[in-house]
Amino acid sequence: MNCVRPVMDRSNVTLRTGAKVTNVLTNATGTSVTGVEVEFSDPANCQTSVATFTGDIVVIACGAINSAALLLKSVSDRYPNGLANSSDMVGRHFMFHNSDAMVALSTHENDDKYMKTFGINDFYFGEPDYPYPMGSIQPVGSFKKEMMKSDAPPLTPGFALKIAKDHAVPWWLMTEDLPDPNNRVRVVDGGIRLEYIPNNQTSFNRLKTRWIDVLKRSGHANAVFAWHAYFKKDVNIEGVGHQNGTCRFGEDPKQSVLDLNCRAHDLDNLYVVDGSFFPSCGAVNPSLTIIANAIRVADHLIDRMK
């Protein structure tokens, strides 16, 4: 909202809430987008209404999962498999990082209020005996006993969870998951289905083992991690905060959905500017790259509309 508020007083900006885009509309030949169909909900009266918004240019930014789903739902005679999907690439190459939450327990209470202020990339490009990327490590910003409860043994008393929380030094580990066309977003019976098989697990497991070794050696040096207790939890398909890759950009219309300006190869005026455009995702948070790319595409659109 900090980015939206400064422009809300402009006459050419309108923000509609309680709205869900259900279909992207095209002209008769399917060469350009004419607008979007929107469903409005009124929870107070349990009513819905539908409206159509038109525009010379349509930009989709629903997140990699929902942007792909919207295109797949927007079927027509010209696009029976989904809009902008002549390549059959829409929804494919879904990525969200191999991630692991790891908690080390210290002999000292951890009262640091600014934990998420640094990152560790020492192993990002591998090691001398393992010349393959492994990933990044960073502290977790905050940690509560309720977060430990989900992974603690049954009937663990609350006071024990609080002690563990007070002594916790939590870490977040990320390794790149590789683009795989079989990892994908699909629309089945009107609902969204994610199909995903983890990959690059050798690098992921090595990063976890390597970091545990670092923590253990830190403990031997100064007793900070003397308990040698490490709670680990891999983040599975439900943790898709770093979703990307479902409408990859590229120069070949047969192997990508978008061109290098994030315009759909199949349509003259449809753009996608969320994490969908990633052809690969690296092993760091994608947010800043998504923002930078959106600004880049915005500059392109300004030039186009002059």
What are these regions (language model features)?
Residues 10, 23-27, 36-114, 274, ...:
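Glycine-rich loop(s) and the adjacent beta-strand/alpha-helix scaffold that form part
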Residues 12-14, 270:
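Short, conserved active-site loop motifs that form the nucleotide-linked donor/cofactor pocket
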Residues 14-16, 223-224:
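General small-molecule cofactor/ligand-binding pocket signal
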Residues 17-19, 40, 251:
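Short loop/edge segments at beta-strand edges and connector loops
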Residues 1-8, 16-18, 199, 203:
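Short beta-strand to alpha-helix junction loop
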Residues 280-301:
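A conserved FAD-binding loop/helix module that cradles the flavin
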